[in-house]
């Protein structure tokens, strides 16, 4: 069956255009008639007369043909006009008959039920002033939207397909009327209508209409008590948002859809965000007087953000922000809401609200949500009362299997004391703790920074301490987070300045990964007072570095101590610098973290005053029990500068270096802090002691300047009187083992890492494809009701073809929504089917990886090239050939060492030097063992000139003992005129079999399966 679509207006326009063309042609033919049909003869002779008659006959024939064409043209234009009129009439008759049929169909239901079968409901009466309007009429039972309500009237409900009508806004007269409720959406498809807004600030908003199967819930209207949110369709749809002012929860999403946002409020807590299954949770509502609403939770998607807290109208205290929504399976947690700021009650500053905790991530994948910031504390203006404390930052959310922990929230600022207040300004809020990283992989979250302590504006008040930085989150496989920085202490005008907040501890890595760095301490508060003013505030201590993982990982660096607060003329002395944090220790393999530097003592400016003492430095972390270097000790804090005839501050000692255990060097001691300038200058600190070296191998760390000589751990070469060959054997063996270990620590188990990364990538690709396909399938299903609605409209207009097209298109789009042909070489299907296509690539990728591994382990090719112009070259071997070369190196170096020892013994005997002969004989076992383990040699291999372009080339093949490091090949080419030139060849290295097995081969296999 075929269909013909005709637009009558276009046919009529075409006929008019053709008539215009015919008119122009007729005028041209008339103008040419006389000159071409009656030609005058050029002469009186017979030839001229014959020529005139001939061409005149041509003109007459043209006019005859033109007349016939004009007749045909007129008939064709008439037919076009007639066809257009016929189509127009048929269309009008069809519409008329369809309208008559529609009226006949609607009549029974309109009479019995007061609503049509197909059609929109009537809008409610508008209403005037304080007089409420009418409710919107219901939509058609099969199809139609509900009518909108008049002033304060409810929206009409839809039938099977259609949207609910919007509730009318409340009337503005008098106290203002409540908004009307939104109408319910269609049973099969349709959105709920929006609730009407209240007519005044004191009036209630209307509730949003509900959806049933497919459709979004209506939003509640705003008002003094806003309207409730409409429910989403059961299968697909977003939950409605609760009305502003309601403090009600947002509606939950359908099976596929987002939760609605909670309503804000000025009289109670903010509403919670709606929950979801496959979609994002709704955001919590904010409140100006109470706690913020919690963010909505979800199964697959992102959690909603928590709402901001407000300020209590009764007490002036800040109220906590809402917690971020958590995720069940896949997705990131929502951010916590900010805590509310505090004000004062009868002049007394109140405490601020804490930030909301970040939501936890999904079980399979996702990052924890960030914690909300704490609010600022209230200021105090009356005597004897403290100012408000800043709110603590919210904790970051935790990850589950894969993902990073959330960052902790920033602490709020402490309140100030002003006027005649004589108590203490508020302390800054503590930073929130970072979230824990994923169990299988992920980094811990960073701790939040502490808040600034409140300043003491009046001379009788004490300044507030800075808030402590948040502790960082730990990790299982991954790096621990960094600790939050401590907040600066508040400044004072005479009495005590605020102490700087301590930095948060770095996060610990539990299995594999490095510990996080500790946060820096906050700066001590300055004191601007003059005579008899208190010292500047002490700087905050730096946070300790986190420990490295049980199997591998470096300890985190300790945080630096905060600088001491400065003082003005007449004050006692500058503030003492904060203590540096201790570096984190490694457990089995890894280096200890560097100790944090001590804070600089505060300077004294103007008049006579003593500079502050430098803060003590942190010690370096200890190395892993098996292998690793100890951390360097922190630098001692420098003393602050004195003024006038007063002394500068004393510098502190440098931190001790961390110790090694079995293999590794001790950490160097930190440098002592410089003494502060003054009269006299402050004494400098001593350098820290270096850490002890490993028992099997390692040197003790150097003492930091300007300290005494390092207390060196006795090494084997200095404490055990053995012969040189045995010393070389032990030193070379330990050095090569250390090199192998360091290379492995830099990239442990690369093949296993790449394999696990591939599997995780396949899993993520599969879950993403299934999630996208499920979402697009639901979107396609949701598109069927609107298409049916469009098809009904087309049928009502007599357009059967359009109706069929709408229905078929909707069914197809459930599976394929379109085609992406932007790249003709890679045309892609869109929609659920196209979403699933990437999964089909996984078996091929796995098969290709297996093939690549097989090809790598069976590759016996050798490739060589040299560019004598640019002095570059490449020498590559297949993996089995490279491993064979590495395996045969040890027998060669052993034989060389045996031959050298034999030659030395024979030469000494022949020379009559019995002492040298005895030494060669005693040292021979060590030399042979050293050759077997650590020997290195290069074997010359002359290449045929036919393979080198006629230039003589000799390749030096590196061979080594089983522990010898891998070395590149070298080639020497004898270039005419220039002479011999040595080129280091890129490509495959060669050496000991152990580093080849531990480091080189796994790297080659990892590259074989890398995407």
From Swiss-Prot:
Residues 130-696 are annotated as: PGRS domain. Residues 697-1011 are annotated as: C-terminal domain. Disruption phenotype: Deletion mutant is attenuated in vivo during murine tuberculosis, specifically during the chronic steps of infection. On day 28 post infection, shows a slight reduction of the bacterial burden. On day 70, shows a strong reduction of the bacterial burden. Mice infected with the mutant show smaller, non-confluent tubercules. Mutant shows impaired ability to survive and multiply within murine macrophages. It is unable to inhibit phago-lysosome fusion in THP-1 cells. The keyword Secreted applies. Residues 595-701 are annotated as: Disordered. InterPro entries: PE-PGRS_N. Residues 1-93 form the PE domain. The gene is PE_PGRS30. Belongs to the mycobacterial PE family. PGRS subfamily. Its main location: secreted. Mediates suppression of pro-inflammatory immune response in macrophages via modulation of host cytokine response. Required for full virulence. Involved in inhibition of phago-lysosome fusion. Residues 595-696 have a biased composition (Gly residues). This is PE-PGRS family protein PE_PGRS30. It comes from Mycobacterium tuberculosis (strain ATCC 25618 / H37Rv). One of its GO terms (cellular component) is cell surface. Both the PE domain and the non-PGRS C-terminal domain possess independent cell wall localization signals. The PGRS domain is responsible for polar localization of PE_PGRS30. PE and PGRS domains are necessary for the cytokine-modulating function. The non-PGRS C-terminal domain is not exposed on the surface and is not required for full virulence in vivo. Infection of human THP-1 macrophages with M.smegmatis expressing PE_PGRS30 results in reduced production of IL-12, TNF-alpha and IL-6, as compared to infection with vector control M.smegmatis. No differential effects are observed on bacterial persistence inside macrophages or on macrophage mortality upon infection. However, expression of this gene in M.smegmatis is sufficient to enhance the ability to persist intracellularly and induce murine J774 macrophages death. Differential response of the human and murine macrophages could be due to cell-specific processes.
